[in-house]
Curated annotation (Swiss-Prot):
It is found in: Cell inner membrane. Membrane-anchoring subunit of succinate dehydrogenase (SDH). Residues 53-68 are periplasmic. Belongs to the cytochrome b560 family. This is Succinate dehydrogenase cytochrome b556 subunit. One of its GO terms (molecular function) is succinate dehydrogenase (quinone) activity. One of its GO terms (biological process) is cytochrome complex assembly. Its main location: membrane. Residues 1-26, 90-108 are cytoplasmic. Its cofactor is heme.
């Protein structure tokens, strides 16, 4: 009987050949966006501290924020934060019973979360630039 169990286990665990459902992708990206947001808090607090330290510090922070690369990073941070908040609300709505916990409802809510995040990302781009 033990030999049958071993034969039924998956052999190929190459992640490039496994097709994740959209709900798994949404969950993984939620974790990634949380890590990005966590790291970004330190960077943003440093930038805030620099800008509030003195008039020269404010000028330095303004010069840093004037760079296209920094604006792009800021847009990425805001997009990650927006995604994390939107999908976090989705998870809370499922936990509180406001959304069905079926696979179809999960796929639908994940797609809606992606669309809302794209809209918020575009708004963040307008805000940054």
């Amino acid at each position: 009987m033990i030999r049958n169990v071993k034969k039924q286990r998956p052999v190929n665990l190459d992640l490039q050949t496994i097709r994740f459902p959209i709900t798994a992708i949404a969950s993984i990206l939620h974790r990634v966006s949380g890590v990005i947001t966590f790291v970004a808090v330190g960077i943003l607090l440093w930038l805030l501290g620099t800008s509030l330290s003195s008039p020269e510090g404010f000028e330095q922070a303004s010069a840093i924020m004037g760079s296209f690369f920094v604006k792009f990073i800021m847009w990425g941070i805001l997009t990650a934060l927006a995604y994390h908040v939107v999908v976090g609300i989705r998870h809370m709505m499922m936990d509180f019973g406001y959304l069905e916990e079926t696979f179809e409802a999960g796929k639908r809510s994940a797609k809606i979360s992606f669309v809302i995040t794209v809209v918020l990302s575009l708004l963040a781009g307008v805000l940054v630039w």
